[in-house]
Amino acid sequence: PVADVELSEIESAELAERDGGVCVGLPVAGAEVRIVPLGFGPESVPEPVAHGVTGEILVRAPWVSEGYLGLWATQRAARPGAGDWHRSGDVGHVDLAGRLWVEGRAAHVVDGAGGPVTSVPVERAVERALGLMRSAAVGVGPAGAQQLVVVVEQPDADAGPADAEIMARVRNEVAHPVAAVLSVPSLPVDVRHNAKIDRAAVAAWADTVLAGGRVKPNW
């Protein structure tokens, strides 16, 4: 475990910070959390960012595993500077009360010209506004100039651009500029959990559709 939180605290925290991601609470006794700038290399551990600033989540605790069996490249990336901080691969921030908020995976951050956009706050805002079970916020385009595209899961809709009303509601709800809103009958998820969205596949499909290519997804 890294953090702990009661349901009542989740509810009160999310009222105060509606689109901050998922509040997972204060670090448990013996665990340390550090939020560092996105995209740092494996040579050293950067200084933490300020409260409220999004970055990558590092964790240090006596019970954190010392390595990945047989995965040397993964081990090197996960332990920057050969220290005891572990790169979780998640992104988030710490609020003024010291609570940790998770905003998604580092691999899923949209790297746009206006700064990084994390997936979970966007998806939660869209799902709340439209009453959906699933959506995916992905980046299309080259790193540093990616455009934010939202793909919504609508079982009765055809794959392709969402209708004008859906587009307007998404753009009104999301705090970042949304380049396009697309619909699919279903989003690709892992077979084991039926929960983890394959955002790489969604981003590749969105890129193809917006370039005038095949609309039917291949999942």
PLM features: residue spans?
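Catalytic cores of large soluble enzymes that bind and process phosphate-bearing ligands
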Residues: 16, 25, 49-52, 60, ...
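Short linear motifs in exposed loops
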Residues: 31, 104, 120, 192-193, ...
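Conserved AMP-binding/adenylate-forming
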Residues: 1-92, 96-97, 106-108
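Non-catalytic alpha-helical coupling and interface elements of nucleotide-dependent molecular machines
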Residues: 38, 131, 155-157, 207, ...
